[in-house]
UniProtKB/Swiss-Prot annotation:
This is ATP synthase subunit alpha, chloroplastic. It comes from the Eukaryota. F-type ATPases have 2 components, CF(1) - the catalytic core - and CF(0) - the membrane proton channel. CF(1) has five subunits: alpha(3), beta(3), gamma(1), delta(1), epsilon(1). CF(0) has four main subunits: a, b, b' and c. It catalyses: ATP + H2O + 4 H(+)(in) = ADP + phosphate + 5 H(+)(out). Produces ATP from ADP in the presence of a proton gradient across the membrane. The alpha chain is a regulatory subunit. It is found in: Plastid, Chloroplast thylakoid membrane. The gene is atpA. The record marks 363 as: Required for activity. Its EC number is 7.1.2.2. SUPFAM superfamilies: C-terminal domain of alpha and beta subunits of F1 ATP synthase, N-terminal domain of alpha and beta subunits of F1 ATP synthase, P-loop containing nucleoside triphosphate hydrolases. It is a peripheral membrane protein. Belongs to the ATPase alpha/beta chains family. ATP binds at residues 170-177. It comes from Porphyra purpurea.
Length: 504
């Protein structure tokens, strides 16, 4: 018979008790009540946070937006075709965040920062919340550096500064995206990181943007975030916040950044769709009550940081599409009141051949000359007034037959000024050449040149300054002002070029 040794048995039991280790994982689980139209109603999930990411059985991710007494309204970030009634939903305990890093430059990503350009996964330096807090009042400084767009009409009359929010507004097909892309192309060599956010656009349009940026060598410092027209409304809604989060990563490293939201009308429509499906009460134009907050919390993230925070900046160029030039609709008025000015593009001007079709009368920059170099302030001070007076006279002169000499001269000057502000797409002009062009027009040097010859004259003048008098450009780039020596050089260049152009 075997001897039973109680001490041995008790030591074995003690060892097993010590080794016993049970990991208890507490999960927040709910059940799908109904699903459809990109919305799921979920029962349970008592511990869920507003905006928390939820994972469904088929690995679809959703965001908890409506926290009601008996269920949770969830918007889906996928089509959710495999989600069934009664299937389980798990809370992740995380708020939406994306990977960020320098490797995202030159890449095309979706609103969750997943690459869609078949170039592999970009290396990330960490993550950022998609919806992070905007910098506070103390962390900011006033806008003081220019963000040159390369478009003469904008840089002279509606200047944009680093850290400003300038709305680009107009009907469809008036060149809104062209203005934004020209601005990106003009940042080449300026050490500015650009983010282009395409919301609800055709995939072919986005492909065109990518190829034109690539052609101009601008893709190397640009990140493209796209939620195409066939993407779920949730992705179209979060795309601008993703773009802002990517730009913030660079801004807090002390860099200047430029973000283009193309366009926020489609984001508002996606948000309206989600809100109505979640049965939130509709307001004006069926938009939910918090549609103002939708855009204000996005655009407030644009800032010029003070030197303690590294002095970085985020400049925002939101785009809004109007219907038949109606700027008094709900979304346009909201965004106009949030931004620091607007550039209004007119369909009538566009169709009459004035491109970029900027309506100078109702376009404004609330930062003003603080965002201009001194040379531009010196020459462009009177330009807006001259053009406004010309527009008034032109309308009046259609009814009057005999005009006095002074009026005729003013009309002739106005026609030439309008001509010098015309510009081809994807061909930004450096600020020193813009200064020369405006100086020539505003001081009457073009008055004796035929209107149809003005564009050729400007091309020749730019060539002459670049090739024969490079010190003019160097002087303005270094001193930022038009001194007497530079002015004499410019006058000499105008005289030299004018010899082949004077009206017969």
């Amino acid at each position: 018979m075997v001897n039973i040794r109680p001490d041995e048995i008790s030591s074995i039991i003690r060892q097993q008790i010590e080794k016993y280790d049970q990991d208890v994982e507490v999960a927040n689980i709910g059940t799908v009540l109904q699903v459809g139209d990109g919305i799921a109603r979920v029962y349970g999930l008592d511990e869920v946070m507003a905006g928390e990411l939820l994972e469904f059985e088929d690995k679809t991710i959703g965001v908890a937006l409506n926290l009601e007494s008996d269920n949770v309204g969830v918007v889906l970030m996928g089509d959710g075709r495999d989600i069934l009634e009664g299937s389980s939903v798990k809370g992740t305990g995380k708020i939406a965040q994306i990977p960020v890093g320098d490797a995202f430059l030159g890449r095309v990503v979706d609103p969750l920062a997943r690459p869609i350009d078949n170039k592999g996964e970009p290396a990330s330096n960490g993550t950022r919340l998609i919806e992070s807090m905007a910098p506070g009042i103390i962390g900011r400084q006033s806008v003081c550096e220019p963000m040159q767009t390369g478009i003469t009409a904008i840089d002279s009359m509606i200047p944009i500064g680093r850290g400003q929010r300038e709305l680009i507004i107009g009907d469809r097909q008036t060149g809104k995206t062209a203005v934004a892309l020209d601005t990106i192309i003009n940042q080449k060599g300026q050490d500015v990181v650009c983010v282009y956010v395409a919301i609800g656009q055709k995939a072919s349009s986005v492909a065109q943007v990518v190829s034109s940026l690539q052609e101009k060598g601008a893709l190397d410092y640009t990140i493209i975030v796209t939620a195409n027209a066939d993407s779920p409304a949730t992705l179209q809604y979060i795309a601008p916040y993703t773009g802002a989060a990517l730009a913030e990563y660079f801004m807090y490293k002390g860099k200047a950044t430029l973000v283009i939201y193309d366009d926020l009308t489609k984001q508002a429509q996606a948000y309206r769709q989600m809100s109505l499906l979640l049965r939130r009460p509709p307001g004006r134009e069926a938009y939910p009550g918090d549609v103002f907050y939708l855009h204000s919390r996005l655009l407030e993230r644009a800032a010029k940081l003070n030197s303690d925070l590294g002095g970085g900046s985020m400049t925002a160029l939101p785009i809004i599409e109007t219907q038949a030039g109606d700027v008094s609709a709900y979304i346009p008025t909201n965004v106009i009141s949030i931004t620091d000015g607007q550039i209004f593009l007119s369909g009538d001007l566009f169709n009459s051949g004035i491109r970029p079709a900027i309506n100078v009368g109702i376009s404004v920059s609330r930062v003003g000359s603080a965002a201009q170099i001194k040379a531009m302030k010196q020459v462009a001070g009177k330009l807006k007034l001259e053009l406004a007076q010309f527009a008034e006279l032109e309308a009046f002169s259609q009814f009057a037959s005999d005009l006095d000499k002074a009026t005729q001269n003013q009309l002739a000057r106005g026609q030439r000024l309008r001509e010098i502000l015309k510009q081809a797409q994807n061909s930004p002009i450096p600020v020193e050449e813009q200064t020369a062009i405006i100086y020539t027009g505003i001081n009457g040097y073009l008055d004796d040149i035929a209107v149809n010859k003005v564009p050729d004259f400007i091309i020749k003048l730019r060539e002459d300054l670049k090739n024969s008098k490079p010190e003019f450009g160097e002087s303005i780039r270094s001193s930022k002002k038009l001194d007497t020596a530079s002015e004499e050089l410019l006058k000499k260049a105008i005289e030299d070029v004018k010899q082949g152009f004077v009206k017969a």
